Design a protein with these regions (language model features):
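Residue-level marker of positions within ordered structural domains that often coincide
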Residues: 12, 26, 100-103
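Residues that cap or initiate secondary-structure elements
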Residues: 13, 43-44, 64, 73
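Short amphipathic alpha-helical segments, especially helix-boundary/capping motifs
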Residues: 1-2, 31, 70-75
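A generic "functional-site adjacency" signal
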Residues: 1, 15, 88-92
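C-terminal terminal-subdomain/extension
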Residues: 58-105
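Residue-level detector of secondary-structure boundary/capping sites
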Residues: 12, 49, 85-89
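Compact nucleic-acid interaction/catalytic patches
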Residues: 3-6, 14-57
Length: 105
């Protein structure tokens, strides 16, 4: 598992709304059975979810997705789907979004 990799969401009840999950957990905690993820929603499906600093927009396979940072959650590693992208190039955007969510700064 690597921080800032994007996985397919395999959960039957959420995968249609949030097809991708962004792993934001540090690699130093790979020994845990869980990973912290941010759901990615297709930008076209979102009406009012966009807040520039809190919900950065990224592109995966030619499609734009909104990172729904306020919906941060934990998931068992075994439930993560295959890796489809690496968004480490957007690291600063995700760290800033998490910082804003947790500290308001």
């Amino acid at each position: 598992m690597s921080q800032f990799t994007v996985h397919r969401n395999q959960h039957p009840s959420t995968k249609s709304r949030f097809p991708l999950l962004l792993d934001v957990q540090t690699d130093f905690l790979n020994g845990l059975a869980t990973r912290v993820v941010i759901p990615l929603m297709p930008q076209a499906a979102s009406k009012s979810q966009k807040m520039d600093k809190l919900t950065p927009v990224v592109q995966v396979d030619g499609k734009r997705y909104i990172a729904l940072t306020p919906q941060l959650s934990g998931i068992a590693k075994k439930e993560l789907g295959p890796v489809v992208a690496d968004l480490a190039a957007h690291r600063v955007d995700f760290i800033n979004a998490l910082d804003f969510l947790l500290t308001g700064i």
